[in-house]
């Protein structure tokens, strides 16, 4: 089974367990933890080979889950949707070093994505480094990452 498939199975299982938390299902922090962990694991899988790659997945998942949980605790559905759409637009079309912003007029939360260096990884995928900054309830948090274009164009 490919590493990505394993990550997706873990994310799906975690999601189903989170949904069993009672009325209302998964809360914002749980969602942030899950998505951050899955994203961190995917990011970590881009580095190293063999055991080194597994270490990268573990470290990425842990760091992503912690940061995602902290950010998710204060983000609502609209914040997440705006951040996701902005991230996609920034990584696909924005020049390196430019800030692409989002702002939720209902709660005042905002953030921006700054795409940086574009490169090809060891498997030939086009990738891009980025910084994501969010300000939730007046508190700023930053995350750094890499996103790679998948063979299906996503």
Curated annotation (Swiss-Prot):
Leader sequence residues: 1-19
Membrane protein topology class: Lipid-anchor
Keyword Transferase: no
UniProt keyword terms in alphabetical order: Cell outer membrane, Lipoprotein, Membrane, Palmitate, Signal
Location of the protein in the cell: Cell outer membrane
Disulfide bond entries: none
Covalently lipidated residues, kind S-diacylglycerol cysteine: 20
GO cellular component term, pick one: cell outer membrane
Residues with lipidation of kind N-palmitoyl cysteine: 20
A Pfam family assignment: 17kDa_Anti_2
Domain of life from the UniProt record: Bacteria
Transmembrane segments: none
Similarity section: Belongs to the rickettsiale 17 kDa surface antigen family.
Protein name (Swiss-Prot/TrEMBL): 17 kDa surface antigen
Organism: Rickettsia parkeri
